[in-house]
Amino acid sequence: MSKLQIIQSKGQYINGEWIKGNGLILESTNPASGTLLWQGNNATDEEIANACYVAHRALKSWANTSFEERARYTKAFVEQVEKNREQLARLISLETGKPLWESQTEVSSVIGKVNLSIQAYQERTWPKQTETAEANACLRFKPHGIVVVLGAFNFPAHLSNGHIVPALLAGNTVLYKPSEHTPAVAELIIQCWHDSGLPPGVINCLQGNANCGNTLLSQDIQGVYFTGSYATGLRIHQQFCNRPEVILALEMGGNNPLVIDEVKDIDAAVYHTILSTMITAGQRCTCARRIIIPDSQTGDLFLERFAKACKLMRIGSFDSQPEPFIGPVISHVQALKHLHAQKQLIEMGGEIILPMSLLLEYTGLVSPGIIDMTRAKNPPDEEIFAPFAQIYRYNHFDEAIQLANQTRYGLSAGLLSDNKDHYQQFYQNIRAGLINWNRPTTGAASSLPFGGVGCSGNHRPSAYFAADYCAYPVASMEQPLLTTPVQRLPGLVLE
């Protein structure tokens, strides 16, 4: 990529305007080539404080805007995304390394999220009224106020959108800090909001690294919506330990299990396992990290075909031909981190079946890896965010469930099995927020809640249930005319 193709940042988006930043240089690169893609600035403390100020100033008017009017703005946003569909998909692929086919599905998810969010708000936070003998019992919902959305790099448009849209529909104003790996995607998304006619100050975008994020969280805010690693989520939780009035919605990934039962269609099991482990270069929080297979002929045959399919998998830049199944991990630094994690597992007794290897220097391109950890001693309960699968063998189904539950996390879990009774046993005993049967662990629907238990979250599921953490309930007993009760309580004399 030549220097002429480098995207120069529009700046920070504050109060409906792009303001050229004055902070330290911030850059994003194409992880498939290592070349510079976007250049801008970290938000300064003053810019962050100013964004918070204008979000507060815009709050009252926005919160008092009718739901129908707020929904109209979100639909106008969808129209802008539709107009920029091809550009947005290409930008996602350039900045994350995803194949173009996958980026196109992400753009479709962004578009589809709005109507689902409107429906969810109307179902979960719509006003209700019940008449009693003495008064009207009313339930209404109010926005929290100014909420911070911290974006993730793996779905830079869709995951942030899954917080922003419900927050705006509920009447909150938003301070959005995208992942420092995907600032260009964020700028285009914010431009779509700008072109929708959204009032100034309702959404503000601040680019920056973790230090900018910390400064942002120290402001006068009422909510934080985060998708990312457990380590970062834990730090956010600790940062707000003395501010219980701030609502936190934390989605923090997992060390997800996929159990392979005795199945007739081995190829189907291999296919769904690949979609569970390797899609998005293993960079989905619902990716299966641990594949639990029977210690039998079925298990041997499955593992042989799984390894062969991973070895033959096409990996490369999004514009490669023929089209790849996966691209790189998000950066060269992360690729080296994952390779180091693989080395540590080998030192613990893991047996390499297919080594994960760096395919091109100075990039995030790595090949899929498979390691058998059955005989390893005390394997770490950590999420390796890469195309890398750990194999564990079991002798009976009860043992498979026991192995699956050996994690402090609890986001997703899956079972590939022709046995309905085994699925019922699996479902009843597995502790996870998403439990799939004969579907990839990465399979999820925006019409359902999305979240985990344990160290995977703090019981604030997103997707269809995002409306729940974007507004708080207000219960009211109301009577239009002040009257004295006919029957008064004993012991009171009114003259």
Curated annotation (Swiss-Prot):
It is an enzyme of class 1 (oxidoreductase). It catalyses: N-succinyl-L-glutamate 5-semialdehyde + NAD(+) + H2O = N-succinyl-L-glutamate + NADH + 2 H(+). Keywords: Arginine metabolism, NAD, Oxidoreductase. GO terms for cellular component: cytoplasmic side of plasma membrane. The active site is at E251, C285. GO terms for molecular function: 1-pyrroline-5-carboxylate dehydrogenase activity; succinylglutamate-semialdehyde dehydrogenase activity. Its EC number is 1.2.1.71. PROSITE patterns: ALDEHYDE_DEHYDR_GLU. Pathway: Amino-acid degradation; L-arginine degradation via AST pathway; L-glutamate and succinate from L-arginine: step 4/5. GO terms for biological process: arginine catabolic process to glutamate; arginine catabolic process to succinate; proline catabolic process to glutamate. NAD(+) binds at G228, S229, Y230, A231, T232, G233. Catalyzes the NAD-dependent reduction of succinylglutamate semialdehyde into succinylglutamate. PANTHER family: DELTA-1-PYRROLINE-5-CARBOXYLATE DEHYDROGENASE 1, ISOFORM A-RELATED, DELTA-1-PYRROLINE-5-CARBOXYLATE DEHYDROGENASE 2, ISOFORM A-RELATED. Belongs to the aldehyde dehydrogenase family. AstD subfamily. This is N-succinylglutamate 5-semialdehyde dehydrogenase. It comes from Legionella pneumophila (strain Corby). The lineage of its organism: Bacteria, Pseudomonadati, Pseudomonadota, Gammaproteobacteria, Legionellales.
